[in-house]
């Protein structure tokens, strides 16, 4: 039986989702829990390769399991063996050929920025602090310029395999910035992402909020394909994978 499992995790202690040698990862810890519950280590297919320090509110993964543990007991059983910074949320059966990464037609990320002079001791590891005042209207106007189908080479870190193969065109369907007190939230929904794309996009929006660039400069930035003309890559700690959309499963 092929299953789709939704999990949530705080990525602070982990070197990303994918299993890596000599480094703690979310997938490795999850497979340890599966070993304890199932007596085996299923091949886990994640929806994304989140980097070290990145968090996820609803991360999707698929795996095959044909053992005796009934589906309705899997989530509580896994949680009994998982650390508190990783939680299993929901599970459902899916088609045998379902792959959590390739079946996704959109993912939503959010980047959280604390606009304050000092860090908040309760959120310092889940948001990035900017001390100087940010102009919300400028950030919103700049965000709107990213919506659409573009070559996002300028928002791609070096070393990207997609960039090496010229596969840098993506479609952003939503890009917004909202403010709630000192907290700025950047939300991006797209059909796919390049390496560090959201963190570079967020850094570019911060530049706009600080008056270092105008919203009207964004189209020329994208047209240039030059990473050096975009903003800085903001720290991983402010980035969350919020949602993964699958055809026919969007209400799950």
Give the ranges of each region predicted by the language model.
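Structured-RNA-binding interfaces characteristic of tRNA pseudouridine synthases
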Residues: 1-252
């Amino acid at each position: 039986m092929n299953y789709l499992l939704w999990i949530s995790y705080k990525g602070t202690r982990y070197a990303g989702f994918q299993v890596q040698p000599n480094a703690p990862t979310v997938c490795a810890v999850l497979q340890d829990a599966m070993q304890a519950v199932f007596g085996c280590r299923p091949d886990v297919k994640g929806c994304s390769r989140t980097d070290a320090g990145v968090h996820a509110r609803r991360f999707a993964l698929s795996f095959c399991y044909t053992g005796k543990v009934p589906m309705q007991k899997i989530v509580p059983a896994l949680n009994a063996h998982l650390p508190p910074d990783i939680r299993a949320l929901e599970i459902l059966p899916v088609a045998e050929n379902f792959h959590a990464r390739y079946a996704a037609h959109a993912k939503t990320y959010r980047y959280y920025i604390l606009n304050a002079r000092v860090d908040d001791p309760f959120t310092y590891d889940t948001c990035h602090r900017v001390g100087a005042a940010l102009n919300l209207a400028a950030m919103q106007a700049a965000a709107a310029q990213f919506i659409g189908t573009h070559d996002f080479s300028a928002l791609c870190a070096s070393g990207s395999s997609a960039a090496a193969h010229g596969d840098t065109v993506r479609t952003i369907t939503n890009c917004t910035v909202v403010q709630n007190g000192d907290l700025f939230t950047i939300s991006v929904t797209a059909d796919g992402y390049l390496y560090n794309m959201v963190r570079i996009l967020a850094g570019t929006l911060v530049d706009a909020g600080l008056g270092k660039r105008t919203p009207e400069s964004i189209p020329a930035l994208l047209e240039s394909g030059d990473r050096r003309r975009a903003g800085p890559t903001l720290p991983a700690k402010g980035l969350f994978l919020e949602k993964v959309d699958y055809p026919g499963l969007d209400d799950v």
